[in-house]
Structures are given as C-alpha cells and as structure tokens.
C-alpha cells in the first residue's frame, strides 16, 4: 500500500532556507568534519556540543527553539536531560570470569530499556578533540524508534509526533546508560554514561559499527539489521573486562550504493551519491552546509531515517534475505 504524502515535507530541490537561517551559517562545517582529509584524526567538537565549542551555536539554538514549538516536544526532551545521579564505585569488585561479566552486562542492559547491546574496544579517534576517555571498553546501546511515530517527521506546531518519538528514545538512552553505568559501578568498576541528544566526549556511530550493531548508511546514520535506520544510540565506557562483539556485514553498505530513496527524499539535497574521504576513511557523508539549515527549520527533520527502506518493518526482512543471497550467506562477522 502506498503511504500518503506527508504535507510537512517539501520536495527535493524546492526548499531554500529563510534568509535569517542562511545568515547563521557563517562557516562551512564540511572542513571542520574533515571532508577531503586523507589522514585519520580525532573529530572536532561539532553540532550539539556546547555552543562555545563550534561556529554553529546560533543555528543549534534555532534548531532547539523550533523543535520545542512542536506539541509535546518540551516534555519529551526534558526527560532526555533528566540525568540520574551517578554512584561511587563499590570498594568490592566482582571478580567473575569475563564471560560471566559480559553476559551480566548484556542482560542488565536489555532489562533496562536497551533494545540491542554491543561491546567494542575503545579507539582514540572515537574521542572528540579536547575530551578524554581513559576507559578501554565501550558498551553501545541501541534504542529503537516506533516506526509509525517516526514516519510522521518532520514535526511542526501542528504535529509533534515524530520529534516526540526522537525525544522519547533519547530519554530511554539516558535512563538505560545511566542505569548500566551505576550497575557497573556497583560491581566495583569505573563506568561513565554517554547518552544523547547533546554531544560529549564519545562519537557513538563508529563504536556501534565496531560492536556489530549495524553499518553506516548513505544518510550518515546507523542502519541496524533489526531496526533499520530507526535507532538512537547511547554509550557507556568502562574498565570492566568484557568480550567485544564483532562487526556484522549484512549488505546495507552495498544496498546504499544503488539506492536513491533518502537522496530523493532529502529536501535540501544534502545526501551525496558517492562516498568521500573523511578524516582518512572513505565513507558516506552528508553535506553539513545543506543539511543543517533545513534541520534547524524543520524541528530536527529525520526524513532520511524514516524513509530508509531498511526502517520499514514490512521491507527489512526481504532486504536481509536479498542481500544475504548477494553476499553469499547470512549476517557475517568480520
């Protein structure tokens, strides 16, 4: 069945930013993100970091203001910013075998709102410049969107369903990551939570990919084999001994190379057709200078992840089967 057109979505190529919005994009974000750089480096603080750490603070404030105009959005995001208190690590350490600790972490996270759990060894280039993370491991939590609510994006003063679901998943990420960090601390280990939507020390998508939660999509977001692009992420770094989960290849990257759905759905035309070199890695990249003005005006947008074929519950199983056949097997561990 064909889905009805969303009246809040302008067609690609028909949208231009308001003059006052365009005036706030005083610098290009693409060089700051490392587009065209051939050598790996740590990412620079960027959108959703404190506004004094990057040149786009005014646009960030406009994005938040427009988001909060949507019905229910303020309450949804207030829950995301309701950070529980962190306890001090216990003086008594749980010395169970690494296999048992890994199972305990996974079971605790899944019992406390996380929909998927992955574990990776920390990499220096996952930490933003100016920040420090000393812990050797990162646990990444995936929080799945409600598809029927997500497909309502973008939101505005008449309909806040989509952006409220974004806020709700970030709130689950806050609770889940803080609860897990406190549980790990209760076992005698160090642990720090890193939920969204505000950015902190930890870049979340690369460790999510390394931990087997998905692949990077053409739209610059994670594609999960279980939930498609309809996920939000939170992280917990720790010194607890844990067994890493392995990256998984299930065909999203190959599919994105030929798919044009998100490219055609993006009103400002920000999704590029080919991979680019970004901080020494050839990868999918979204043009920040085109994306963010629309993102700011459209209450945080979300069109690309809602329109992604992998996000549609009725389509995703067929894609998994088709791509597994093309790859010569099922989900693979690399």
Predicted regions and their residues:
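Catalytic cores of enzyme domains
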Residues: 99, 106, 115-329
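Iron-sulfur (Fe-S) cluster-binding modules
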Residues: 1-119, 129-134, 306, 310-334
């Amino acid at each position: 069945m064909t889905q009805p057109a969303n009246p809040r979505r302008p067609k690609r190529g028909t949208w231009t930013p308001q003059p006052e919005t365009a005036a706030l994009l005083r610098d290009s974000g693409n060089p700051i993100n490392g587009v065209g750089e051939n050598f790996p480096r740590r990412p620079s603080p960027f959108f959703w970091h404190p506004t004094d750490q990057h040149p786009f603070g005014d646009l960030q404030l406009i994005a938040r203001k427009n988001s909060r105009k949507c019905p229910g959005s303020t309450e949804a995001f207030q829950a995301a910013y309701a950070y529980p208190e962190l306890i001090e690590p216990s003086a008594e350490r749980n010395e169970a075998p690494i296999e048992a600790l890994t199972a305990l972490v996974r079971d605790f996270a899944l019992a406390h709102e996380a929909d998927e759990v992955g574990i990776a060894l920390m990499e220096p280039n996952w930490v933003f410049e100016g920040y420090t993370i000393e812990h050797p491991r990162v646990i990444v939590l995936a929080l799945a969107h409600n598809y029927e609510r997500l497909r309502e994006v973008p939101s505005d003063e008449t309909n806040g369903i989509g952006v409220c679901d974004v806020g709700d998943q970030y709130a689950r990420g806050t609770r889940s990551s803080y609860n897990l960090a406190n549980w790990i601390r209760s076992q005698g280990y160090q642990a720090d939570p890193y939920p969204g939507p505000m950015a902190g020390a930890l870049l979340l998508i690369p460790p999510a990919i390394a931990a087997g939660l998905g692949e990077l999509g053409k739209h610059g977001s994670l594609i999960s084999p279980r939930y498609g692009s309809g996920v939000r992420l939170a992280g917990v770094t720790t010194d607890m001994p844990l067994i890493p989960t392995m990256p998984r290849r299930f065909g999203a990257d190959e599919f994105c190379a030929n798919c044009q759905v998100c490219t055609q759905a993006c009103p400002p035309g920000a999704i590029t057709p080919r991979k680019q070199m970004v901080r020494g890695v050839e990868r999918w990249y979204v043009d920040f200078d085109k994306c963010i003005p629309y993102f700011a005006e459209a209450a945080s947008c979300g069109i690309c992840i809602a329109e992604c074929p992998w996000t549609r519950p009725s389509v995703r199983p067929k894609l998994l089967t088709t791509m597994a056949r093309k790859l010569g097997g099922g989900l693979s561990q690399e």
